[in-house]
Amino acid sequence: MVKITGSQRIDLLGIRKADLPAVWADLGMPSGQAYTKGVRMVKTCVGTEFCRFGTQDSTAAGIEMERRFEQLFTPHKVKMATVGCPRNCAEATVKDIGLIGQENGWQVVVGGAAGKSVRKADLLITVETTEQALEASELFFQYYRENANYLERTYDFVERLGIEKVRKETVYAPEPARKALLDRLVKAKAHAPDAWLEGRTPKHKTQFIPLTPLETVNA
């Protein structure tokens, strides 16, 4: 089955595990993460290009956002979204990190949730440019990676620390501290593994091949 998901991804369902390397070789494209503790997706609306209400190019911002964060691991799953106006069609206010387009810039919000317990994201900062919004997202993202407990979602993390402390230690931190956070994120990104590239040329092919059961050996 091929399914278009609510997070704007494509699910390929029902494929045998042993066939996965051949399937990805034929597709010639990377895979997103479905279950890992890391970045899941960046959902976008159509922004200024196809919507009369759009005030910012949310599609381009979302593409760049995904490029900066894909393949990175985190204490728990991270979902992101960008919307071109406050109508919030891509649900940025209930994502771990969201960018909300305004007439004169972006609101960056963090710590939202839309699952069993719904939580509206907190405002991290309001900025004028897309690059500033992306940098604010990077600061929060790396701060969360370094300071959250394992299996702690961003909404629990923000509530535990308080949004004022989060702001103080990310977007309003002294310039050297901000630069250090960003440098560590860049370094992590440079060494981020591509699990599906490894899957196409596995060191141990038995990862995708069923093992033959061992016969019982009598003493």
What are these regions (language model features)?
Residues 1, 28-32, 70, 74, ...:
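Generic secondary-structure signature for well-ordered alpha-helical cores
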Residues 1-6, 75-78, 146-160, 179-187:
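Flexible, glycine/charged-enriched surface loops at secondary-structure junctions
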Residues 1-107, 201-219:
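Small-residue-enriched alpha-helical segments and adjacent helix-cap loops
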Residues 16, 54-58, 62, 129-133, ...:
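Generic structural signal for well-ordered, non-membrane alpha-helical segments
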Residues 71-73, 109-118, 179-187:
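Short, conserved aromatic-histidine micro-motifs
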Residues 79, 84, 88, 93-153, ...:
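Mobile "lid/hinge" segments at catalytic clefts and subdomain interfaces of large enzymes
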Residues 162-166, 172-173:
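Glycine-centered helix-coil hinge/cap
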Residues 171-205:
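Acidic, Ser/Thr-rich low-complexity intrinsically disordered segments
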